Amino acid sequence: MVSKRKLSKIDAAEESSKTDLQSRCPETKRSRISDKRAPSQGGLENEGVFEELLRTSGIILKVGEGQNEIAVDQTAFQKKLRVALEKHPSYPGVVNEFISGLESHIKDRSQFKNCLLPCTPARTEGSRTLVHSYCESLIKLLLGIKILQPAVVTLLLEKIPEFFFDVVGTFGTNFPRLIVNQFKWLDGLLDSQDLVKKLMQMLSVSPVPIQHDIITSLPEILEDSQQNEVARELSCLLKQGRRLTVPILDALSRLDLDAELLAEVRQSAMTIVPSVKLEDLPVVIKFILHNVKAADAVEVISDLRKSLDLSSCVLPLQLLGSQRKLKSQAQASSSMSQVTTSQNCVKLLFDVIKQAVRFQKDVSEAWIKAIENSTSVSDHKVLDLIVLLLIHSTNSKNRKQTEKVLRSKIRLGCMPEQLMQNAFQNHSMVIKDFFPSILSLAQTFLHSAHPAVVSFGSCMYKQAFAVFDSYCQQEVVCALVTHVCSGNETELDISLDVLTDLVILHPSLLLRYATFVKTILDSMQKLNPCQIRKLFYILSTLAFSQRQEGSYIQDDMHMVIRKWLSSSVPNHKQMGIIGAVTMMGSVALKRNEADGGLLERPELSIECDGQLSTLLDLVGFCCEQTPEVLALYYDELANLIEKQKGNLDLQLLDKFGKSLVEDFPNDFVVDLSPTVDGSFLFPVKSLYNLDEDETQGAIAINLLPLVSQSEPGRVADEMSNSRKRVVSPICLSPCFRLLRLYTGEQNNGSLEEIDALLGCPLYLTDLEVEGKLDSLSKQEREFLCSLLFYALNWFREVVNAFCQQQDAEMKGKVLTRLQNITELQNVLGKCLAATPGYVPPPATFDSEAPEGVPSINAGGPVRKKNGKKRKSDSSKACSAERTQADESSDGNQPDTELSELEKSATEKETGNPLAQLQSYRPYFRELDLEVFSVLHCGLLTKSILDTEMHTEASEVVQLGPAELCFLLDDMCWKLEHVLTPGSTRRVPFLKERGNKDVGFSHLCQRSPKEVAVCVVKLLKPLCNHMENMHNYFQTVIPNQGVVDESGLNIQEYQLMSSCYHQLLLAFRLLFAWSGFSQHENSNLLRSALQVLADRLKPGETEFLPLEELISESFQYLLNFQASIPSFQCAFILTQVLMAISEKPMTGWKREKMASLAKQFLCQSWMKPGGDREKGSHFNSALHTLLCVYLEHTDNILKAIEEISSVGVPELINSAKDGCSSTYPTLSRQTFPVFFRVMMAQLESSVKSIPAGKPSDSGEVQLEKLLKWNIAVRNFHILINLVKVFDSRPVLSICLKYGRLFVEAFLKLAMPLLDHSFKKHRDDVQSLLKTLQLSTRQLHHMCGHSKIHQDLGLTNHVPLLKKSLEQFVYRVKAMLAFNHCQEAFWVGVLKNRDLQGEEILSQASAAPEEDSAEGSEEDTADSAAEEPDGTDSDSGGAGR
């Protein structure tokens, strides 16, 4: 141990002489150091200048494992060593010797390591050290001595290359890192520039690990003045490679950079986001988010959204699914490791985002805004959905905003369900943390009135159940049960649908929570028949899929069903039948699957069969006395056979089938005879016989006698008799449906046994009712109506039954039956018009009875929007503009309450029976989807028959226009009901929801995809019919939009026009289906597009990419524009093209859409009678079409200016009932529509002009000023139109959108004017002067509204005046900012009316108040009071 005694001056001199002697013999010293090793106690035996000076200064060098020791304070050591060196006789040469000694000493790696590691305080026995517990390393201490620093720095940098090729850890130490660490936090660095320069040079040649160490140490080495320069170099390095991303960003985040450089570096980081390694991605994102400023947060987040693609993170996750296929267990283990790593990286990524969102308010709001600003459907990603969920769960303040944005995106189709499925399936580890938010949002979405939002909420439930743990699954089930028990129709239906999907996809999982589902049985009174069917399907599937576990559910179901069947309440009996038949379906399924009944014990199957037989007997006994209940039983059994086609036990079929085969002929069929015995209200006549050549064994449907027997008095007589079963015509169609499905099931689809029923006649009466109805009594008219309803429903079921038969003769008979239906509908329409208050017999029995008495109105719609009646046009005498505007104040917006079909039905011509019978749809039997296979038949119009008289039409029966219109109308109703559009209308009010499934019972048992597949198969015949329509209208409309009425058959024209309308609507309903956005339906979409594209390129479309198929389909449909017969057809064609072009919308399609919409707007739409098309629905379509034109045109401001500067003046100069010659759709009646759209689109377009920035170049400023100049000019033109068109709706539009425009100007234009005023003073002054004129007119409107005390208008006034006042002060602030207050002057702004006349009551009071109160000011804007009450000069113009 070396003694710690202090050296005297003599000792110091002796040491110096020794040092001097040693310095003269360097060779000897080096050989000693290199050859001689330390003794066992760890000291050095032979000392040189280096060792001696260190020892005398207080450092004891150690070799081996021991660290160097320091006996004095660090600063004392440095001072002693510096003094010793400076006073050494050979100074400054001694410095070189000292460095040489250091160099020799650190050749040994263990000694070098000791010099790089912190020294330890030297301790002596029995004494306490005064040295601090932590001491720097020897090298660090030497670097703190200025005379040694340059040489030590050079020595250390030269040592680094020695370790280039060392594997870290070879010697147990990372030497490069230790070396670089010595340069950190040096207080007295002599040449910082040189050190950093050498380090950067070293960086360029070093291996990656050493580069990593150097970069991460730079922030602690650099001086403040060097940070920006080095940051630029690091930014360049960041762009060159991806291996140093993490250390570079780590270093940059610790540097104090100026704003410009920070933006540049952040942009560099942004560019590498798409290609950076997954494990480095969290670091990159953290750097970007933590260095974002409030001013550019939205821009940065928007760029980040575009760059960050989670699909690259999914690729490793896909290995999880394929790992089972790997033969090697080692490979499988490796795959699992990769998947885990990938999931952890994604988790870290969202943890980074979560931290930024939680602690940086700007980031949270900017992310929401960035998602909100994204408009294209293709721009939205899984990332957006996850971030919205993250913000919703993290920031309580942003929850409402987040929910609003998510709702909006779902409604617009930007957040398809496929996107959500990807999020749940690929990132479940991340999303599980947001489960409370997911549950909350799903519950909220189910309350929505928008089908797309409701569907999204239900999908959230399904995905959460599928991918989360048991706790989450239980919460999902409890939430769904709560929805069902809430009594809300929408929630109830959707929740049951979700549970149905879950029981199909995850029966074993749902069975765990069957106890919760079973509690719904306690709330059965709230369920309608369709909902009961769904519930019992769910419970039956759970009860019978695994017999032992589900036995307790079976007992409860039996108990409830028996209770209902025994009830005397018809509604309860109805519920019991539906429950019983649904349960039968689950019991009677063939057990041939691996988990089916073949593996079960025989006695269990016998027990179930016994239960089933007992249940069947009970149901049959309870039904036989009530026709409606018996008809329901027949329908439910028929639905069961159809749904489980081929899977039902044959014994069950035989049990009720044999009696059915016997009962139907006995009850409803009689032998055909010339006369019928009995007394009836009308003489019996056999009609519609298609088998007149078959006289022997002919049969007929005994309809009229049965209808006579079913009258109330006769039914009572029958009930008093001892008959067990009542025969009613109500049961005719349901019983036949069950018979034909039973027969088809037993005979592999063949209906040969009952084909006589297709052509057999009906016992009706003479149906030539023209002119006879007025002479009939009410009872006779109602009897006749009932007879026609029964006949129509019989024919509809016959068509359902035989439409798929391949025999040519039977096909012909089916087409004839369709003709019979259209003929009977004409007769029925006339009868119903003469029989007000008549309620038809029921035709559907599994839905609640429609409320109220249906009515028929051949001249117009049954109901108006919001259920309100239209006021009489003659109520007041006022201007044409005011009258029409008041009528259409609500009609100029797209109608959200009526469906497309309801809207079209209200405007159809009086001659179309379909328009008359719309309100009676619930009283007709439902057509099956298979009926539409008849559309494959060709179209034969009367005009073709007239020109080909030699052709006998009886030889080939083809589909006529009336039959085509009938089929298309029904198909469109079905499609609209089941295919939810991506951007959808609102659901009708909840009070109407109870009847929404009436007439769609069979359809609702099919999934939307099944319906879509069916329609895609029909696209070829639909295209054929469309082309026939196109050819027809090209001949009758030789000039664009002008009907050639010479020799025109008006009725045929109307029918063909209706067919065209329905065809286009069918295309729109199909291609707007939201399901096409889901990945699993992509092949179906391709098949649909391929059919359309094949019409232009036959045989060339099979291998075309999707984008080309879309383009060809778009072009095919675009070709129909020349033959469009009505504005409604034009509107729907535009919607079809929109639906197709959005997948995706490209530049040339936008141009075509704008051109097409403008063409329709510039076309004169006339009816065949010569009247101009008009009405609220015309206005609604016009609103949408005008929006399409302005949204897709290249220059929206120019388009608005053209309409307002060309079209409107033409209208003003035209006659009272005239229109614009350039835009014939612009008339005094439609002006409010044009005005609203132009104002809304103008306000929307200026919001897209970026706000002015100080950094904008002069050219950019000028371009923005030009845009604002045009916008303000358009605004001025539109506002001044109020002087001519002063109706209340126009004023309301002005006040609303005027305020929004001024607010947008304040937010976006004023910053631009601040920075461009000096450079472009004249332009700014001109802009403000023009705007001043507009805002002055707005002020006049405020006065006008107050004078007339119109509450609808005055509600807008306070907010508008506030905006105008803000504008005044904002202009003053701009002038002050530019030191140019004299550029404008202010004056008194007087209150005037719309025509500019001063309001007298205020004019007389003005002189008195002028001196006492503050005056309203008029700068570049309008009305604002000076808060300080100062007077201003009268006037108000800018200089």
Curated annotation (Swiss-Prot):
Coarsely, its chief localization is nucleus
> What are the alphabetically sorted keywords of the record?
Isopeptide bond, Nucleus, Ubl conjugation
**Crosslinked positions (Glycyl lysine isopeptide (Lys-Gly) (interchain with G-Cter in ubiquitin)):** K563
PTMs per UniProt: Monoubiquitinated on Lys-563 during S phase and upon genotoxic stress. Deubiquitinated by USP1 as cells enter G2/M, or once DNA repair is completed. Monoubiquitination prevents DNA release from the FANCI-FANCD2 complex. FANCD2 is only ubiquitinated in the FANCI-FANCD2 complex and the monoubiquitination of FANCD2 is promoted by phosphorylation of FANCI. Phosphorylated in response to various genotoxic stresses by ATM and/or ATR.
Q: Do you know which Pfam families this protein is assigned to?
A: FancD2
Q: What GO cellular component term, any one, is given?
A: nucleoplasm
Query: Where in the cell?
Result: Nucleus
Q: Which GO terms describe its biological process?
A: DNA repair
Asked if the record carries the keyword Ubl conjugation, the reply is: yes
Q: What is the effect of changing K404E?
A: Reduces ubiquitination on FANCD2 and reduces stalling of the FANCI-FANCD2 complex at DNA junctions
**Entry annotated with the keyword GTP-binding:** no
The function of this protein is: Required for maintenance of chromosomal stability. Promotes accurate and efficient pairing of homologs during meiosis. Involved in the repair of DNA double-strand breaks, both by homologous recombination and single-strand annealing. The FANCI-FANCD2 complex binds and scans double-stranded DNA (dsDNA) for DNA damage; this complex stalls at DNA junctions between double-stranded DNA and single-stranded DNA. May participate in S phase and G2 phase checkpoint activation upon DNA damage.
Q: How does it assemble?
A: Homodimer; cannot be ubiquitinated and does not bind DNA. Part of a FANCI-FANCD2 heterodimeric complex that binds and scans dsDNA for DNA damage. Interacts directly with FANCE and FANCI. Interacts with USP1 and MEN1. The ubiquitinated form specifically interacts with BRCA1 and BLM. Both the nonubiquitinated and the monoubiquitinated forms interact with BRCA2; this interaction is mediated by phosphorylated FANCG and the complex also includes XCCR3. The ubiquitinated form specifically interacts with MTMR15/FAN1 (via UBZ-type zinc finger), leading to recruit MTMR15/FAN1 to sites of DNA damage.
State the family it belongs to: Belongs to the Fanconi anemia protein FANCD2 family.
Name this protein carries in UniProt: Fanconi anemia group D2 protein
Which organism is the protein's source? Gallus gallus (Chicken)
Q: Give me the gene this protein comes from.
A: FANCD2
